Amino acid sequence: MDFFRKMSFADSTGDAIPFYHEGKYHIFSLTSPPGTTVYPARLRTTWSHSVSEDLVHWEELPTALYPGEGDEPDASGVWTGSVIYGEGKYHAFYTGYCLTAEYQQTICHATSEDGITWTKDAANPVITPMIELYEKLDWRDPYVFYNEEDKC
C-alpha cells in the first residue's frame, strides 16, 4: 500500500481546519479543484469537508466553499479560516483571495443551517485590512471562537 506519494497540483490539499460539534469531528481543508494546472496550486482553492465520529472512519461531504467569480473578494480562492457554531447556525470565517482587488486578502463570512450547505454573506468582505496598520498582502487566516457565556 502506498501511503506517501508526491501530489500533483490537482491533488493539492492543506491547512486543516478542525471543528467539533454534537459528537462529530469535522475537518475542512484547502483543496485545489480537479484539473488544476496553474501554479501556485492554491489559486481557486476550495474548502473540502470530511466528518467522523471516531477520528478513524471519515465520510467525505460535498465541498463547503468555492471561489467566487469576477471581482468578488474570494474570486481567486477561499483560503484558511475557522468554523464556529452559534445562535443556531454554523459560521465560517475565511480568507477571501482576489488577485485583482485593491485588498487581495480579506476576511469573508459564510453561514450554514446544517453544516453542509453554505451561503456566503452578501456583505463580504466583512473585514478589510487597515493599511496604516497592516499589509495588503499576508493579512489572512482568521481564528474566531464563540463565547457561550456572552453569546458572541
What spans do the regions from the language model cover?
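Beta-rich carbohydrate-recognition and catalytic domains
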Residues: 1-152
